[in-house]
Amino acid sequence: AFSSWG
């Protein structure tokens, strides 16, 4: 799984 916040 991959999550990103920016």
Swiss-Prot record:
Primary localisation category: secreted
Annotated keywords: Amidation, Neuropeptide, Secreted
GO biological-process terms attached to the record: neuropeptide signaling pathway
Origin: domain of life: Eukaryota
Annotated localization: Secreted
Residue list for modification Glycine amide: 6
Gene Ontology CC annotations of this record: extracellular region
Function: Myotropic peptide. May be important in the stimulation of ion transport and inhibition of diuretic activity in Malpighian tubules.
Protein name: Locustakinin-1
Species assigned in the record: Locusta migratoria (Migratory locust)
